[in-house]
Amino acid sequence: MNQQQSALLNNLTIIKPNFHAFTAKFHSKLAQSSIEMNSPTALQFNEKSFTLFCVLERIVKHLDKPASVAPFLAHHLMYLKKSGASHSDIALLSNAFYETLEEHLGKHFTTESQLAWKKALRYFESFASNVLFNVTNVVSLQQRMQQKQSNKI
């Protein structure tokens, strides 16, 4: 387990006893945002809070093994697809989640854990964009060479 995973798991341990309050705050932030997807009601969100915690914990525990996280995360991303999530919704979800962490953890949201969550959420955004919308931030070598050629003309 690397330092990033350790920081994330420590934060999850702090949040776990009061995860229903965390998910209620997260739902509230999503409701206030300009998210386009059909989000669940507060009651439905609360009912799914244990599942959300288990999914988060499993992903964090295996972050150092992307090959084992990818299929699991892809499976759970289908919920977002069924909910009509747009590409911009992915960033809104990440931002709301990060803000909720910041408020809920308070002084326990150290610089180390902030960086770890930012990195994990960037991974989530990139992976979700690729799986749900076939958008990637990786440019193939051939594409890059063609771009350079067209710039020379």
Each PLM stretch: what is its role?
Residues 1-153:
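Core of compact, soluble alpha-helical bundle domains
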